[in-house]
Amino acid sequence: MGKSDRKLTEENSIENGVKPGKLTEEEMDAIDNSSQSKIVAIASMAKRLGLGLGSDLSQVEYPSSFIAPFSTLNFFSNNFANHFNILLRANKIENEMDRLIEVFKYSTTIHKIPEDCMKVPLNAVIGETQSLNFQTPDLNSPNDLISDNYLITEQVSELPPNTATCIYNKKEGVKALFNHESKIVFQITNVKTPTTGRKYVRFDKFDEEYDIEFPVLHSRFMRGFVEYCGEGSIKSNKSKCFVSTNYIAKPLIGGNYHAYEAKVYNGIDSKPIYKISGQWDGESKITNLKTNETKPFFKNITTTTNFTPTILNTDSSVVWGKIIQSVAQGKPINLAREKSKIIENQKTLNWAPSQFFLNLEMGVWEPKLLND
């Protein structure tokens, strides 16, 4: 049976041992030059690749018209830093319940939605890095800026794809660490991107860490939008207080985009103390379930953080420079050929982690700089 005859069946799924095929350069060029709609093009690619329910798309090469002008490495990482000042404020809060709620507030700001659900980021290559420092407004004194905040990220594994990102202020003793191992799973009418790996926030002052569980990102290309769905949580290693969150899928008719409902527990009572609800990319409200008092919780405003990059020879902007420029300008490019050149060049670097080391005891990639 040829590629063109393959059907979208569960027999072609990754769980049953059949990995996606590969598009030829001629097939990619034909898709890029076609006048057909993106939906039709996706169906055509799925058939040629032999995709089935559950197929892993993490290493699939796409035509350039389906590529976004950035890498998976920095797709999420900058968003982790944009509201870092919420954590710096939480570091001043002595009450453990109030501090937990502030960490939850930060967690609602780090979700990233691509502008075009029909395009995917470039797969980061091993050793790719990004390094930034930035200032952020002091939420306790809005006219002042807090300096010495840093973001470092590195692609520490290619198969499976694993990105390590850390945002920290060493002076304040505040750190957010994300080990982001993900895969892209074909679901026939949508694509989901589940992630594994430890993600946590640490306050040295309290010797406390909060583990964060992410919901799953769904790209609903048939409906034209992307959303997070499923359960999330935040738990402390010292306090019994925790947050349980449900990220709600938008119904076919009615409902809101990016809705969620969270419940805050003190770890003693089986009933929640607070309920927080709204839209994570918009406005939320918090209700005290004992008094039924409801008040505004948070308005997630898009911020523009002025990052100052430290450009290494492994920086994303260097690694992908030619491809990103061509894609951003809408120019056709032989993606497979250009990426092969990049991979071969990366191999000559004799890569060893430059920004992170594997903490075997904790099973996470930790930043070297904080352990020097």
Curated annotation (Swiss-Prot):
GO terms for cellular component: cytosol; membrane. InterPro entries: OSBP_sf, Oxysterol-bd. One of its GO terms (molecular function) is sterol binding. It comes from the Eukaryota. Residues 1-10 have a biased composition (Basic and acidic residues). Disulfide bonds: none annotated. It holds the Pfam family Oxysterol_BP. Residues 1-25 are annotated as: Disordered. Belongs to the OSBP family. This is Oxysterol-binding protein 3.
